[in-house]
């Protein structure tokens, strides 16, 4: 969430659950007294259901803070770049939002362009916010920090895991995968599940689908400075070769045009990587907990995943 001046930030503290907390530096000089009427512009993104959830939260906030008017703009975008472009347009036209919901991958860009204000003093001066901050894993907060300053609190996480079809494993006589399995074990399992027009795995060529592979191989697209490209590093090349090998061997469908989530729901793919965002889609398709489960991403050099 973004706040205007110091006292406005204090009044908005209970709206933190709306979104990532991120304060526009261009508004930081404005001081608003608690009894003044205030309008806060909120920029959010998502579908109609997500917009309704945010509006419900805003309504609850307004009940406790009748002098604060919250105006939400919810952008139904198809891509993250569309949302960022909307934000840039609002900023350059003098209509920058006070509160914004940002993905973790946008934080460095926003901080480096001096668009956000640190939240450390706000959180330290409020017991409720301090308690909320302490609920998060330190590794998660690192993504919303720069140097010694914290610029946001997440309203949710999307941890990449491998979902697998229980029935396909049962039919193939395979044990369900366990956390800590390796790339080699993953490929061997996917190969055994590939038969009769069914693929063992599907990896759509998207950032979130590919990142866990080089992350578990101790690699990244950029260096620790966040600027130096490392896309040709050994770890990334090895990850891409690993996936390309599975595609060439017929273990995975064509990655550009394949809809792995739909194929998984239709029993055409035994395993697929995703976050929790796909669960509603599968629920609507009739899948239940009896049909599938999830496991941590397979490991090459480094345990963990991406969120």
Model regions and ranges:
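Short glycine- and hydrophobic/aromatic-rich loop-to-beta-strand nucleating segment
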Residues: 160-164, 214
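A local structural motif
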Residues: 65-76, 95, 173-178, 226-228, ...
């Amino acid at each position: 969430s973004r706040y205007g001046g110091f006292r406005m930030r204090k009044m908005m503290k209970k709206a933190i659950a709306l979104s990532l907390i991120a304060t526009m530096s261009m508004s930081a000089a404005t001081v608003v007294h608690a009894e003044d009427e205030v309008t806060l512009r909120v920029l959010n993104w998502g579908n109609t259901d997500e917009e309704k959830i945010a509006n419900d939260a805003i309504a609850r906030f307004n009940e406790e803070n009748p002098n604060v008017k919250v105006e939400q703009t919810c952008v139904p975008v198809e891509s993250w770049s569309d949302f960022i472009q909307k934000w840039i347009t609002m900023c350059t036209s003098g209509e920058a939002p006070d509160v914004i919901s940002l993905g973790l991958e946008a934080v460095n860009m926003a901080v480096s362009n001096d668009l956000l204000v640190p939240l450390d003093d706000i959180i330290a001066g409020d017991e409720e916010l301090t308690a909320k901050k302490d609920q998060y894993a330190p590794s998660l907060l690192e993504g919303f920090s720069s140097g010694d300053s914290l610029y946001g609190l997440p309203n949710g996480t999307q941890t990449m895991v491998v979902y697998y079809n229980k029935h396909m494993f049962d039919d193939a006589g395979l044990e369900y995968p366990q956390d800590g399995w390796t790339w080699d074990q993953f490929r061997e399992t996917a190969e055994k599940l590939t038969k009769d027009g069914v693929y063992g795995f599907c990896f759509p060529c998207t950032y979130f689908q590919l990142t866990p592979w080089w992350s578990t191989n101790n690699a990244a697209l950029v260096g620790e400075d966040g600027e130096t490209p490392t896309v040709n590093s050994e770890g990334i090349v090895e990850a891409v070769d690993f996936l390309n090998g599975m595609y060439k061997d017929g273990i995975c469908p064509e990655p550009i045009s394949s809809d792995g989530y739909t194929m998984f729901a239709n029993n055409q793919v035994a395993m697929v990587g995703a976050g929790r965002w796909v669960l509603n889609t599968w629920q609507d398709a009739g899948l239940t907990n009896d049909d599938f489960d999830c496991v941590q991403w397979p490991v090459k050099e480094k345990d963990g995943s991406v969120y």
